């Protein structure tokens, strides 16, 4: 988890 990786950038809905 960096800054804008799949963890934070991926859509939840």
Curated annotation (Swiss-Prot):
It is found in: Plastid, Chloroplast thylakoid membrane. GO terms for cellular component: chloroplast thylakoid membrane; photosystem I. One of its GO terms (biological process) is photosynthesis. It is a peripheral membrane protein. Keywords: Chloroplast, Membrane, Photosynthesis, Photosystem I, Plastid, Thylakoid. It comes from the Eukaryota. Transmembrane segments: none annotated. The keyword Ribosomal protein does not apply. Stabilizes the interaction between PsaC and the PSI core, assists the docking of the ferredoxin to PSI and interacts with ferredoxin-NADP oxidoreductase. Belongs to the PsaE family. This is Photosystem I reaction center subunit IV. The lineage of its organism: Eukaryota, Viridiplantae, Streptophyta, Embryophyta, Tracheophyta. The gene is PSAE.
């Amino acid at each position: 988890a960096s800054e804008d990786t799949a963890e934070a950038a991926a859509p939840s809905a």
